[in-house]
Swiss-Prot record:
Keywords: Ion transport, Membrane, Mitochondrion, Mitochondrion outer membrane, Porin, Transmembrane, Transmembrane beta strand, Transport. Pfam families: Porin_3. GO terms for cellular component: mitochondrial outer membrane; pore complex. Consists mainly of membrane-spanning sided beta-sheets. Belongs to the eukaryotic mitochondrial porin (TC 1.B.8.1) family. This is Mitochondrial outer membrane protein porin of 36 kDa. It is found in: Mitochondrion outer membrane. Its main location: mitochondrion. GO terms for molecular function: porin activity; voltage-gated monoatomic anion channel activity.
Length: 276
Protein backbone atom coordinates (compact mmCIF):
# COMPACT_ATOMS: atom_id res chain seq x y z
CA UNK A 1 0.00 0.00 0.00
CA UNK A 2 1.24 3.48 -0.93
CA UNK A 3 1.99 5.71 2.03
CA UNK A 4 1.21 9.38 1.60
CA UNK A 5 -1.41 12.04 2.31
CA UNK A 6 -4.31 9.73 1.41
CA UNK A 7 -7.59 10.99 -0.04
CA UNK A 8 -9.47 14.19 0.76
CA UNK A 9 -11.98 12.18 2.80
CA UNK A 10 -9.13 11.20 5.13
CA UNK A 11 -8.65 14.80 6.32
CA UNK A 12 -10.12 14.94 9.84
CA UNK A 13 -11.32 11.31 9.61
CA UNK A 14 -9.68 10.18 12.87
CA UNK A 15 -11.50 12.86 14.87
CA UNK A 16 -14.82 12.18 13.09
CA UNK A 17 -14.57 8.45 13.78
CA UNK A 18 -13.84 9.11 17.45
CA UNK A 19 -16.74 11.55 17.84
CA UNK A 20 -19.45 9.97 15.68
CA UNK A 21 -18.65 6.40 14.60
CA UNK A 22 -20.55 3.50 16.25
CA UNK A 23 -23.03 5.78 18.06
CA UNK A 24 -26.52 4.47 17.28
CA UNK A 25 -29.98 5.62 18.33
CA UNK A 26 -31.88 2.83 16.57
CA UNK A 27 -31.81 -0.97 16.65
CA UNK A 28 -29.65 -2.66 14.01
CA UNK A 29 -28.88 -6.32 13.41
CA UNK A 30 -26.40 -7.61 10.82
CA UNK A 31 -25.46 -11.21 9.97
CA UNK A 32 -22.75 -12.22 7.50
CA UNK A 33 -22.15 -15.73 6.17
CA UNK A 34 -19.82 -17.17 3.54
CA UNK A 35 -20.66 -19.79 0.92
CA UNK A 36 -18.34 -22.63 -0.02
CA UNK A 37 -17.32 -20.64 -3.11
CA UNK A 38 -16.28 -17.64 -1.00
CA UNK A 39 -19.30 -15.41 -1.66
CA UNK A 40 -20.13 -13.22 1.34
CA UNK A 41 -23.86 -12.82 2.08
CA UNK A 42 -24.98 -10.14 4.54
CA UNK A 43 -28.50 -9.55 5.85
CA UNK A 44 -29.25 -6.35 7.77
CA UNK A 45 -32.30 -5.08 9.61
CA UNK A 46 -32.83 -1.58 11.02
CA UNK A 47 -35.70 -0.52 13.28
CA UNK A 48 -36.27 3.24 13.43
CA UNK A 49 -39.26 3.92 15.64
CA UNK A 50 -42.18 2.11 13.99
CA UNK A 51 -40.33 1.76 10.69
CA UNK A 52 -38.39 -1.40 9.83
CA UNK A 53 -35.88 -1.44 6.97
CA UNK A 54 -33.97 -4.44 5.69
CA UNK A 55 -31.50 -5.29 2.96
CA UNK A 56 -29.53 -8.25 1.67
CA UNK A 57 -26.12 -7.87 0.07
CA UNK A 58 -23.58 -10.17 -1.52
CA UNK A 59 -19.88 -9.71 -2.20
CA UNK A 60 -17.82 -11.71 -4.66
CA UNK A 61 -14.05 -11.35 -4.99
CA UNK A 62 -12.17 -12.65 -8.01
CA UNK A 63 -8.48 -11.74 -8.05
CA UNK A 64 -8.45 -7.90 -7.99
CA UNK A 65 -12.13 -7.45 -8.89
CA UNK A 66 -14.79 -7.12 -6.18
CA UNK A 67 -18.51 -7.10 -7.00
CA UNK A 68 -21.04 -5.91 -4.41
CA UNK A 69 -24.81 -6.24 -4.94
CA UNK A 70 -27.41 -5.04 -2.43
CA UNK A 71 -31.21 -5.25 -2.52
CA UNK A 72 -33.29 -3.14 -0.11
CA UNK A 73 -36.93 -3.20 1.01
CA UNK A 74 -37.89 -0.79 -1.79
CA UNK A 75 -36.65 -3.30 -4.40
CA UNK A 76 -33.72 -1.10 -5.35
CA UNK A 77 -30.67 -3.02 -6.54
CA UNK A 78 -27.32 -1.37 -5.80
CA UNK A 79 -24.34 -2.71 -7.73
CA UNK A 80 -20.70 -1.71 -7.27
CA UNK A 81 -17.77 -3.18 -9.20
CA UNK A 82 -14.30 -2.33 -7.89
CA UNK A 83 -11.08 -3.04 -9.77
CA UNK A 84 -8.14 -2.74 -7.40
CA UNK A 85 -4.69 -1.86 -8.74
CA UNK A 86 -5.21 -2.18 -12.54
CA UNK A 87 -2.09 0.02 -12.39
CA UNK A 88 0.07 0.82 -9.35
CA UNK A 89 -1.84 3.05 -6.92
CA UNK A 90 -5.01 3.10 -9.06
CA UNK A 91 -8.51 1.92 -8.18
CA UNK A 92 -11.53 1.96 -10.51
CA UNK A 93 -15.12 1.87 -9.22
CA UNK A 94 -18.26 1.48 -11.33
CA UNK A 95 -21.64 1.78 -9.61
CA UNK A 96 -25.32 1.97 -10.55
CA UNK A 97 -28.77 1.52 -9.03
CA UNK A 98 -31.68 -0.29 -10.67
CA UNK A 99 -34.24 1.04 -11.60
CA UNK A 100 -32.68 4.56 -11.39
CA UNK A 101 -31.41 5.18 -14.92
CA UNK A 102 -29.44 8.28 -13.86
CA UNK A 103 -27.48 6.60 -11.08
CA UNK A 104 -24.59 5.21 -13.12
CA UNK A 105 -21.19 6.55 -12.07
CA UNK A 106 -17.53 5.86 -12.78
CA UNK A 107 -14.97 6.71 -10.12
CA UNK A 108 -11.17 6.70 -10.19
CA UNK A 109 -8.90 6.79 -7.15
CA UNK A 110 -5.17 7.27 -7.34
CA UNK A 111 -2.78 7.18 -4.40
CA UNK A 112 0.79 8.41 -4.66
CA UNK A 113 3.53 9.02 -2.14
CA UNK A 114 2.87 12.76 -2.35
CA UNK A 115 -0.70 12.98 -3.67
CA UNK A 116 -4.15 11.44 -3.56
CA UNK A 117 -6.80 11.98 -6.25
CA UNK A 118 -10.44 10.92 -6.41
CA UNK A 119 -12.61 11.80 -9.39
CA UNK A 120 -16.03 10.61 -10.56
CA UNK A 121 -18.48 11.37 -13.34
CA UNK A 122 -22.12 10.42 -13.75
CA UNK A 123 -23.10 8.36 -16.78
CA UNK A 124 -25.77 10.76 -18.04
CA UNK A 125 -26.08 13.32 -20.82
CA UNK A 126 -25.46 16.17 -18.33
CA UNK A 127 -23.44 14.51 -15.58
CA UNK A 128 -22.35 15.67 -12.17
CA UNK A 129 -18.56 15.75 -12.04
CA UNK A 130 -16.71 15.37 -8.75
CA UNK A 131 -13.03 15.95 -8.11
CA UNK A 132 -11.00 15.88 -4.93
CA UNK A 133 -7.26 16.07 -4.61
CA UNK A 134 -4.70 16.14 -1.83
CA UNK A 135 -1.02 17.04 -2.00
CA UNK A 136 1.53 16.55 0.76
CA UNK A 137 3.04 13.71 2.74
CA UNK A 138 2.46 11.75 5.96
CA UNK A 139 2.86 14.95 8.01
CA UNK A 140 1.15 17.77 6.10
CA UNK A 141 -1.66 17.54 3.54
CA UNK A 142 -3.56 20.24 1.65
CA UNK A 143 -6.56 19.45 -0.53
CA UNK A 144 -9.79 20.50 -2.20
CA UNK A 145 -13.15 18.85 -2.95
CA UNK A 146 -15.25 20.11 -5.88
CA UNK A 147 -18.51 19.15 -7.60
CA UNK A 148 -19.64 20.64 -10.92
CA UNK A 149 -23.13 20.26 -12.41
CA UNK A 150 -22.76 20.29 -16.19
CA UNK A 151 -26.52 20.75 -16.59
CA UNK A 152 -26.56 24.13 -14.83
CA UNK A 153 -22.92 25.10 -15.24
CA UNK A 154 -22.58 25.69 -11.50
CA UNK A 155 -20.31 24.37 -8.79
CA UNK A 156 -22.52 22.52 -6.29
CA UNK A 157 -19.67 21.88 -3.85
CA UNK A 158 -16.45 23.72 -3.14
CA UNK A 159 -14.47 22.67 -0.06
CA UNK A 160 -10.86 22.90 1.05
CA UNK A 161 -8.94 21.21 3.85
CA UNK A 162 -5.60 21.17 5.63
CA UNK A 163 -4.22 18.43 7.88
CA UNK A 164 -1.19 18.09 10.16
CA UNK A 165 -0.19 14.71 11.59
CA UNK A 166 2.44 13.50 14.02
CA UNK A 167 2.95 10.22 15.85
CA UNK A 168 0.25 10.97 18.45
CA UNK A 169 -1.61 14.06 17.19
CA UNK A 170 -3.73 14.91 14.16
CA UNK A 171 -5.13 18.42 13.59
CA UNK A 172 -7.20 19.54 10.62
CA UNK A 173 -8.95 22.62 9.29
CA UNK A 174 -11.69 22.55 6.64
CA UNK A 175 -13.65 25.21 4.77
CA UNK A 176 -17.01 23.78 3.63
CA UNK A 177 -20.34 24.78 2.08
CA UNK A 178 -18.69 27.12 -0.43
CA UNK A 179 -16.97 29.00 2.37
CA UNK A 180 -20.00 29.31 4.67
CA UNK A 181 -18.69 27.00 7.41
CA UNK A 182 -15.25 26.37 8.83
CA UNK A 183 -14.40 23.34 10.97
CA UNK A 184 -11.34 22.60 13.07
CA UNK A 185 -10.74 19.14 14.52
CA UNK A 186 -8.19 17.62 16.87
CA UNK A 187 -7.30 14.01 17.68
CA UNK A 188 -4.73 13.02 20.28
CA UNK A 189 -3.58 9.54 21.27
CA UNK A 190 -3.07 9.59 25.04
CA UNK A 191 -2.11 5.96 25.65
CA UNK A 192 -1.59 3.65 22.65
CA UNK A 193 -1.64 0.45 24.75
CA UNK A 194 -5.28 1.01 25.77
CA UNK A 195 -6.19 2.96 22.60
CA UNK A 196 -7.04 5.91 24.84
CA UNK A 197 -7.65 9.05 22.81
CA UNK A 198 -9.36 12.41 23.02
CA UNK A 199 -10.80 14.49 20.21
CA UNK A 200 -12.71 17.67 19.51
CA UNK A 201 -14.42 19.41 16.61
CA UNK A 202 -15.39 23.08 16.43
CA UNK A 203 -17.62 24.29 13.59
CA UNK A 204 -18.56 27.91 12.85
CA UNK A 205 -21.30 28.95 10.42
CA UNK A 206 -20.81 32.42 8.96
CA UNK A 207 -24.41 32.72 7.71
CA UNK A 208 -26.01 31.93 11.08
CA UNK A 209 -23.04 33.02 13.24
CA UNK A 210 -23.40 29.81 15.26
CA UNK A 211 -20.67 27.72 16.83
CA UNK A 212 -20.88 23.99 17.56
CA UNK A 213 -18.29 22.28 19.75
CA UNK A 214 -18.12 18.51 20.23
CA UNK A 215 -15.56 16.79 22.44
CA UNK A 216 -15.11 13.08 23.06
CA UNK A 217 -12.88 10.30 24.28
CA UNK A 218 -12.39 6.55 23.93
CA UNK A 219 -10.69 3.86 26.01
CA UNK A 220 -10.18 0.09 25.94
CA UNK A 221 -11.45 -1.53 29.12
CA UNK A 222 -9.86 -4.77 27.94
CA UNK A 223 -8.62 -6.03 24.55
CA UNK A 224 -12.20 -6.80 23.46
CA UNK A 225 -14.22 -3.96 25.05
CA UNK A 226 -14.25 -0.28 24.06
CA UNK A 227 -16.03 2.60 25.78
CA UNK A 228 -16.62 6.01 24.22
CA UNK A 229 -18.23 9.24 25.40
CA UNK A 230 -18.93 12.64 23.90
CA UNK A 231 -20.73 15.91 24.67
CA UNK A 232 -21.54 18.92 22.52
CA UNK A 233 -22.23 22.59 23.12
CA UNK A 234 -26.00 21.98 22.86
CA UNK A 235 -25.88 19.90 26.03
CA UNK A 236 -26.32 16.50 24.41
CA UNK A 237 -24.20 13.80 26.06
CA UNK A 238 -23.67 10.33 24.60
CA UNK A 239 -21.84 7.18 25.63
CA UNK A 240 -21.40 3.69 24.23
CA UNK A 241 -19.83 0.37 25.07
CA UNK A 242 -18.78 -2.05 22.35
CA UNK A 243 -17.72 -5.64 22.95
CA UNK A 244 -16.14 -8.00 20.44
CA UNK A 245 -17.45 -11.26 21.86
CA UNK A 246 -15.91 -13.24 19.02
CA UNK A 247 -13.59 -12.19 16.15
CA UNK A 248 -15.34 -9.58 13.95
CA UNK A 249 -18.64 -10.01 15.86
CA UNK A 250 -19.60 -6.86 17.75
CA UNK A 251 -22.27 -5.95 20.29
CA UNK A 252 -22.79 -2.21 20.76
CA UNK A 253 -25.14 -0.34 23.07
CA UNK A 254 -25.23 3.44 23.21
CA UNK A 255 -27.30 6.13 24.86
CA UNK A 256 -27.89 9.85 24.48
CA UNK A 257 -29.43 12.34 26.89
CA UNK A 258 -30.17 16.05 26.58
CA UNK A 259 -28.71 17.57 29.74
CA UNK A 260 -30.86 20.67 29.21
CA UNK A 261 -34.05 18.60 29.25
CA UNK A 262 -33.40 15.69 31.60
CA UNK A 263 -37.13 15.03 31.89
CA UNK A 264 -37.19 13.80 28.30
CA UNK A 265 -36.54 10.12 27.68
CA UNK A 266 -32.99 9.14 26.84
CA UNK A 267 -32.31 7.61 23.44
CA UNK A 268 -31.00 4.06 23.56
CA UNK A 269 -29.46 2.35 20.54
CA UNK A 270 -28.42 -1.25 19.98
CA UNK A 271 -26.34 -2.79 17.20
CA UNK A 272 -25.35 -6.43 16.74
CA UNK A 273 -23.01 -7.59 13.97
CA UNK A 274 -22.32 -11.30 13.55
CA UNK A 275 -19.55 -12.66 11.34
CA UNK A 276 -18.13 -16.20 11.12
Amino acid sequence: MVKGPGLYSDIGKKARDLLYRDYVSDHKFTVTTYSTTGVAITASGLKKGELFLADVSTQLKNKNITTDVKVDTNSNVYTTITVDEPAPGLKTIFSFVVPDQKSGKVELQYLHEYAGINTSIGLTASPLVNFSGVAGNNTVALGTDLSFDTATGNFTKCNAGLSFSSSDLIASLALNDKGDTVSASYYHTVKPVTNTAVGAELTHSFSSNENTLTIGTQHLLDPLTTVKARVNSYGKASALIQHEWRPKSLFTISGEVDTRAIEKSAKIGLAVALKP
